[in-house]
């Protein structure tokens, strides 16, 4: 009996539910800003990596969810995504402290930098993540002159890439450390705004986010008969509008059938 070839998974973390969550979280904001990240409530940048051309990609426009997803796709851990025909990975590969991007795009008076990692150390033969970091990650300059801003440095020697269950613990460490330095931060930033006013403007912005509604589905990697069958899971009538809840139900039905 011939044995079937064994295919290795493309990532340790299954991206199926994560990709769907990113649509729910970021698609309304993408529609609201019309793909221009300068038009978000807080103008946004992130960095991804084009490993084929060995360069960073500065994400200023497009699909917000794809940009964030690309910027965190550490090789092997998370499956990369394709943006404009380029396979994109974690931006930290080439620039893990993109203060240069902030200065070039926003010209800030003060940068508050948060350092939660360091340059790769000597790899451990029992730790595949440390081996990957040593092979992939480029050296990063984590310095920030006092004239440009303030550095918050955190030492997380016992934290690994997959420690998602420690989210609250790590959040609290970051929050408490920042609060302890608040006097220093405020001494560098003289402008003050009313917190209630900012909260109100944020509420107005979020209230204008469009509801997720769908009409067309683009399917890749299936023949015409399979495409028709898949589309029927989402809607019987090609002109029918359906909601994100409909998408989730159909999506997981298809996964369970598979």
Predicted stretch roles:
Residues 1-258:
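Patatin-like phospholipase
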């Amino acid at each position: 009996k011939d044995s079937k070839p064994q295919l290795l998974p493309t990532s340790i973390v299954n991206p199926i539910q994560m990709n769907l969550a990113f649509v729910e979280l970021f698609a309304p904001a993408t529609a609201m800003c019309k793909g221009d990240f300068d038009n978000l409530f807080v103008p946004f940048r992130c960095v991804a990596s084009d490993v084929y051309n060995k360069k960073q990609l500065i994400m200023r426009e497009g699909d917000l969810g794809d940009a964030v997803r690309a910027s965190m796709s550490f090789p092997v851990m998370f499956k990369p995504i394709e943006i404009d025909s380029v396979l994109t990975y974690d931006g930290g590969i080439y620039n893990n402290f993109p203060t240069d991007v902030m200065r070039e795009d926003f010209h800030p008076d003060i940068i508050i930098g948060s350092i939660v990692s360091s340059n790769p150390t000597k790899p451990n033969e029992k730790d595949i993540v440390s081996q990957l970091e040593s092979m992939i990650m480029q050296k990063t300059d984590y310095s920030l002159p006092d004239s440009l801003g303030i550095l918050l440095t955190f030492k997380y020697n016992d934290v690994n890439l997959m420690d998602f269950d420690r989210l609250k613990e790590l959040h609290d460490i970051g929050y408490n450390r920042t609060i302890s330095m608040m006097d220093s931060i405020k001494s560098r930033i003289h402008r003050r705004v009313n917190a209630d006013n900012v909260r109100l403007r944020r509420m107005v912005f979020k209230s204008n986010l469009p509801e997720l509604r769908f009409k067309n589905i683009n399917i890749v990697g299936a023949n015409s008969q399979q495409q028709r069958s898949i589309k029927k899971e989402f809607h019987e009538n090609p002109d029918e509008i359906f909601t994100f809840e409909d998408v989730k139900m159909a999506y997981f039905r298809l996964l369970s059938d598979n």
